[in-house]
Amino acid sequence: MANSSLSQVLLMWKPGKIQKGPCSAEQQTLTSRLLRDTETCRRNFRNFPYPDVAGPRKALCQLRELCLKWLRPEVHSKEQILELLVLEQFLSILPGEVRTWVNSQYPESSEEVVALVEDLTQILEEEEAPQSSALPQDTPEDDPNHDPNPASQAGWLSDVVTKDLVTFNDVAVDITQEDWELMPPVQKELYKTVTLQNYWNMVSLGLTVYRPTVIPVLEEPWMVIKEIVEGPNPEWEPKAQAQCPAKHLPELKQDGTQTVKLEDSYDDDNDDSVESPPVCAFGMIHIDEEGFSVKSELSQEDPTEEYLSKCDIYRVTFEKHTNLGVQFDTQSDDKTALYNESKPPFSNASSGGAVRGKILPGDKPYSCNVCGKQFRKYPSLLAHRENHAKEKAYECEECGKEFKHLSSLIAHQRMHTGEKPYECHQCGKAFSQRAHLTIHQRIHTGEKPYKCEDCGKDFSQRAHLTIHQRTHTGEKPYKCLECSKTFSHSSSLINHQRVHTGEKPYICNECGKTFSQSTHLLQHQKIHTGKKPYKCNECWKVFSQSTYLIRHQRIHSGEKCYKCTACGKAFAHSSTLIQHQTTHTGEKSYICNVCGKAFSQSANLTQHHRTHTGEKPYKCSVCGKAFSQSVHLTQHQRIHNGEKPFKCNTCGKAYRQGANLTQHQRVHTGEKPYKCHHCGKAFIYSSSLNQHRRTHTGERPYKCSHCNKDFSQRTCLIQHQRIHTGEKPYGCRICGKAFTQSTNLIQHQRVHTGARHRN
């Protein structure tokens, strides 16, 4: 069926409305006006533009109002609203001319549209019959363009649908020359990728479309060859005038004044193609005298290859596709083929060689010029390139950092500007991101929505729960590349790596001391401020850090929550467990650069360094005595304040140091863990074992500087030195007599008490 016959029928035939019952002229007029108003509201809703100034919230409100005016839920039922949506979709899938004509009849329902189209089909079939009988009888049967099946002539609707269902301009992304010049390279690449992706989506649906050149030709030198003076195809919208390079175009075989109608459609018969050559969707004039088929089969690997071999193609200027310019290249067989710089399937640019004909199994001729990944089909390459184009498309102008999403870039820029728009209403603290404010507010509300399924412990942040769960699983995903030590937290790995690099980026503004961890700096700064906000409820002792308070409270509770998996021994502190575990592994990864001595802990190495430097940073504020270790200062301060926090549960005796309490408890338990390998004698204290060993070896390491007399024990040397100094530190409180040794004082006190020495 020729398109002109369809146009004449649509122009002349005015069907009557399908009546649902008796209706007056006034009711018909009112119904027609109501339908026109409904159609106007629908168009206002569908064509509503996004107002840049008003903002998204106001735009959404306006769009919702337009939708209510169209669907009218206060009047229509759910079934009626559903019918309106189905009617709209049904009208949208009709062929272009039929859709326009049906819309002009203002149908009330989908059934009425069906009736209109069926009546139109019947009329066209009746007019088709006499035209088919009037065809010339000498048509050769072997004509490839001749269709002997009359049924195909009656399928006018499917032909129109094939030609009118989708054109490339329906899905094209139009830009102006000014937009193209302002585009960054990443967005230009995205524009090319999206355009080719739309083309391949249409090809995959079996639609006959002609492949555009993706790279815009706005900056290339063009000259006008021929203008199309007739009206454009209804499917196209006016664009800037496109021009072609003269050097690629042969002389046209038409008069310069002849006009070409882009809206003319054509079928397989090609009887009327002599006077005016057909024009494809991108302005190609086809002058092959044997004609061509719009619905010719396209090759799966090269959809334009078979079609391009049938005819010569000439480029004409038209008022359309400035942004999708087409170039030409002469082949060896004097045929003209399309190509573009975006490496199409029939270009050898993307695959490293000529890709012609069918691709053999296993071949992957299309490669990504970004990462080198290869693909068998070109649409797969296009989809892959689109991912590259979207990757980190937003760049910070301050530091050059790139982001994948615009929202991430906006949040990042607040680091440079210092903007903190999200403020806590309870304490006034401000944050740069809303998520940080949400997490902070849980401090005030006490909310802990994340719960550990193993132990039931609650957390305010998901990240804290994830870190905690590693204590149950034993997972340590972070590994040091230097010593292969693993950690459960990334922050622990970063802190550990500073042991190898020696980096100490955190500096105290008061004394200039540097630290490898920020927490250590915060702890150190409390020495200058003297602030101790954490208080024990049992003994009222105060601490500068909460961790110190927690450790101290375990003295009162006796809790030992850290257990060694090797021997089962339990400890109150995790650091003590770590120290103990090195006795099983024998690992000593911390080495002194001065003497080469190795240690199992970094703290021990730090303390050892002070023996070389003589540094004693911990000073007593009462007597001024300095110490190399903080624990020694803490123990010394108990001499001044009389504190003895370590108490024996058996006899009640108290001690200043926990080690002294441990040694004392062996008196009650009878434990003697230190055994001599020579005679088998056991001792409570390690110092007693060391003194006993000297009886076997004869070693006397302690020498008097006055008389050169040597001793096996340090206490014996101290007592001997009092002979030279005359010091008598042990005085009787009753008579005031002084003695050089404590044993002599004890014997003297029996004189006052009357006690006798037992033999």
UniProtKB/Swiss-Prot annotation:
Pfam families: KRAB, SCAN, zf-C2H2, zf-C2H2_6. InterPro entries: KRAB, KRAB_dom_sf, SCAN_dom, SCAN_sf, Znf_C2H2-type, Znf_C2H2_sf, Znf_C2H2_type. SMART domains: KRAB (SM00349), SCAN (SM00431), ZnF_C2H2 (SM00355). GO terms for cellular component: nucleus. It comes from the Eukaryota. One of its GO terms (molecular function) is DNA binding. One of its GO terms (biological process) is positive regulation of DNA-templated transcription. Residues 166-234 form the KRAB domain. SUPFAM superfamilies: beta-beta-alpha zinc fingers (SSF57667), KRAB domain (Kruppel-associated box) (SSF109640), Retrovirus capsid dimerization domain-like (SSF47353). Expressed in brain and at low levels in kidney and spleen and few hematopoietic cell lines. A zinc finger (C2H2-type) spans 366-388, 394-416, 422-444, 450-472, 478-500, 506-528, 534-556, 562-584, 590-612, 618-640, 646-668, 674-696, 702-724, 730-752. Its main location: nucleus. Residues 127-154 are annotated as: Disordered. Keywords: DNA-binding, Metal-binding, Nucleus, Repeat, Transcription, Transcription regulation, Zinc, Zinc-finger. Residues 42-124 form the SCAN box domain. It is found in: Nucleus. CDD domains: KRAB_A-box (cd07765), SCAN (cd07936). Belongs to the krueppel C2H2-type zinc-finger protein family. May be involved in transcriptional regulation. This is Zinc finger protein 287. It comes from Mus musculus.
